[in-house]
């Protein structure tokens, strides 16, 4: 289980661009919408193998667990390594709030695993170069905080 890192991203600029960012963070997969992850189910590993879906069910027939394994039995954990290397965090954020503070200011607060998603925010800055972003993070478990 990770230490949760609180993040606050404030964007300043054109109202229409801010609405696009607001819509992105209203989705269930904002990080993937900003910086898409490869389609691992259809991406062969270094041995040319595709992962196979493995599911386990509860006694009532509902899905308990699902994962992807290679024919060798090894779990396909490429998603994890890719996220840490590219997003700088393990998975999608837990969005806490989206607040339009003024017609030209949008504030988004969310939690991430362990660290701020600097890679995602770098992509967001690339996609919206006309906006200004101020980003704050606080990870109290290791007592680190800052701006980027």
Which residues does each predicted region cover?
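Long, contiguous binding/interaction regions
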Residues: 1-148
């Amino acid at each position: 289980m990770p230490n949760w890192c609180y993040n606050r991203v404030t964007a300043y600029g054109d109202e229409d661009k801010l609405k696009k960012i607001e819509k992105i963070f209203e989705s269930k997969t904002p990080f993937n919408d900003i910086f898409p992850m490869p389609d691992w189910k259809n991406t062969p590993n270094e041995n040319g193998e595709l992962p196979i879906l493995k599911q386990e069910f509860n006694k009532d027939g509902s899905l308990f667990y699902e994962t992807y394994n290679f024919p060798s039995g090894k779990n396909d954990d490429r998603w994890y390594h890719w996220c840490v290397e590219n997003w700088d965090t393990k998975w999608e954020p837990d969005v806490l709030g989206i607040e339009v503070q003024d017609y030209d200011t949008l504030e988004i607060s969310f939690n991430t695993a362990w660290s701020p998603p600097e890679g995602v925010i770098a992509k967001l800055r690339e996609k919206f170069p006309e906006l200004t972003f101020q980003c704050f993070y606080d990870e109290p478990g290791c007592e680190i905080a800052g701006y980027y």
